[in-house]
Amino acid sequence: MTILPSPVSRLSISSRVAILLAFQVLIGPSAHSQAAPPPSQLTKEQIVQRIDQAVQQRTDGISGYTVQEQYDLYRNSDPTPAAQETIKTTYTRAVGKDYTPIAQSGSSLLRSTVIDHVLAGEKELNLAANREGTLITSKNYEITPQPGTAEVNGRQCVLVTLKPLRKSPHLFNGKMWVDSTDFTIVRLQGTPSQSPSVFAGQATVARDYAKVDGFAMATHAEAHSHTFLFGETTLKIDYTNYKIDRDPTASH
């Protein structure tokens, strides 16, 4: 990079990368895996295999969906969002994502340079040609199950660590909690495996999932970053009103 980004560009890059990491795993595991033996009876290789199967079943099972997404961007310790945007997202497997704005408030500059930039990047990531390379599977990550189980959001989960097999701002180092019975994603935490710019602050992501019509879908995400001039920035996203179109040809 030869041109030093403006302050707004720095904020845009940090927030964009963080939330893109959260968004890209929306195409995550499903809740249609067959019942499995307790994790204690499975080898690490078998657990990874079950996670891969759950991801594939979700990819095959959902032909499309719509969801309402609420974006709230915060600066430092200010309890009032500096910018907000509500959108309706329409996803189809063949095409990817499309957005319909519902409401906007706060700084138009921050919306255009951060939130709208994030949405544009997410749209690119969800193109059919790009989607396979962002899935949380053993093709893209070294997945290492940890011993035992833990309760997360009222569900018994297996914790696995994630290490990308290649450097990419679209992949991340982190942790994932999967349901111990069907190996669908429950929670994700991570940081980019590669910063897009030496000027961008470190970004971290946390994202929660719940079963909607039998599939694991994102319900809440938070991306935190820090820049020299802007300090702490947080982008919060809430997902509601899912309507899922199942693929009738998919096996369950």
Each language-model region and where it sits:
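Structured extracytoplasmic
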Residues: 34-173, 180-185, 193-203, 210, ...
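N-terminal compositionally biased, intrinsically disordered segments and leader/signal-like regions
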Residues: 3-4, 31, 90
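N-terminal secretory signal peptides that target proteins for export/translocation
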Residues: 1-14
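Bacterial N-terminal signal peptides
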Residues: 16-28
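Beta-strand-dense domains in secreted/periplasmic systems and polymorphic toxin scaffolds
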Residues: 188, 219-221
